[in-house]
Amino acid sequence: MNFTYINASTGTSEKFPNKTITHFLHTHLEEFGDTEEDIQKCIDYVLNPNKGGQIIIGTNEDKIVGIVILNNTGMKDYIPENILVYIAINNSQRGKGYGKKLMEKAISSVDGNIALHVEPNNPAKALYEKLGFTNKYLEMRLIK
């Protein structure tokens, strides 16, 4: 598995344009995903030098196997410095260890702690726990 890193320093990738990234994530996140417009906003955040983060694209034989996006929160003193916003593995490539490899790259690619949100019925929850993520808080939201 090879990895391509995209961030504010590298800028966008000719090989993996934003539209390719948004479409891949939208397709492979399935019921756990967001609209392509919202995914694009997350990419824009990564590419903004005043905000930041990291996009990591995992490939095998030049085909995208998985993508992870982390945003820098800028709030390291009171919440984790990074939030893992999206991770998706190609439906046909699941169960081969690519998710674990991509998560390990994501963890090692950023400084500081990482938070993520995962739905209780998401199969990826077990992987996150194996990698050391814990459920420290119950998140509550007021939808207005």
Q: Where in the sequence are the language-model features?
A:
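Conserved N-terminal entry element of GNAT/NAT acetyltransferase domains
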Residues: 1-23
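Short glycine/proline-enriched coil/turn segments at helix->beta-strand junctions
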Residues: 1-2, 61, 108-114, 136-137
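Helix-loop element at the rim of GNAT/NAT acetyltransferase active sites that forms part
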Residues: 18-37
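Active-site rim helix/loop that mediates acceptor-substrate recognition in acyltransferases
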Residues: 33-55
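Conserved beta-strand in the GNAT
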Residues: 55-57, 63-72, 83, 88
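Conserved acetyl-CoA binding element of GNAT-fold acetyltransferases
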Residues: 78-91, 116-119, 138-141
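Conserved acetyl-CoA pyrophosphate-binding loop and the N-cap/start of the following alpha-helix
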Residues: 93-105
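Conserved beta-strand-loop-alpha-helix junction that forms the acyl-donor binding cleft
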Residues: 115-129, 133-134, 141-144
